């Protein structure tokens, strides 16, 4: 028994030494480097897609030169490295830390832009790619948070070089948010929950009136009113549909759940 315990203890000790050696390797190699050299090497690793190594060097730089301007930039670059390495949660945590520590930093526009990008590119699942689904099938929470980040960027920094791209992405996100609501409305119609479907359709018409989902929302609303035995409201809705979408196929044929792809009902 003593021999076994001794062997285990020795093995743990050797393992600890090996781990310590691995952890300290970069620190030892870089111990005489200036802040400029550390940052340049980290950037080289980042540009070479060696994201784990880049993050290590950024962390060493920040711990060794915490008051330098390179330390602040390293925090942002760390977030970008995590983003490129598909470490979304770590990227968001790094961005939020930077915003908390440096609320008046001149690169705050980039921090907001990067936060929006991380959330914008989230949820690219296998099924999403397989079925070629559109953005309305993404997580609405990610859509809303991405929109909020881009909106804050545009409002606070309208002259930022990132503002134009952020605005374009916001348009896509608004359409996606309308699509999120449409997916729910379709689901309720399929289930025969006509009041809930009508409420969702009204929300789209009121809050997402510049999206491509308004026409279908009116068709759903008309049918829901008919199912609820509200002929006057159904007729009013049809007039709105005729006025705004005179060539709509829903004027010839009512909305049918059978027209929807099967994956549209997934959430």
Curated annotation (Swiss-Prot):
InterPro entries: BamD, BamD-like, TPR-like_helical_dom_sf. Keywords: Cell outer membrane, Competence, Lipoprotein, Membrane, Palmitate, Signal. It is found in: Cell outer membrane. GO terms for biological process: establishment of competence for transformation; Gram-negative-bacterium-type cell outer membrane assembly; protein insertion into membrane. A lipid is attached at residue 17 (N-palmitoyl cysteine). SUPFAM superfamilies: TPR-like. Gene3D superfamilies: Tetratricopeptide repeat domain. It comes from the Bacteria. Pfam families: YfiO. It is a lipid-anchor. The keyword Flavoprotein does not apply. Residues 1-16 form the signal peptide. A lipid is attached at residue 17 (S-diacylglycerol cysteine). The keyword Lipoprotein applies. GO terms for cellular component: Bam protein complex. Belongs to the BamD family. Part of the Bam complex. Part of the outer membrane protein assembly complex, which is involved in assembly and insertion of beta-barrel proteins into the outer membrane. Required for efficient transformation of Neisseria meningitidis by species-related DNA. Present in outer membrane vesicle formulations which are used as vaccines in human. HAMAP family: OM_assembly_BamD. This is Outer membrane protein assembly factor BamD. The gene is bamD.
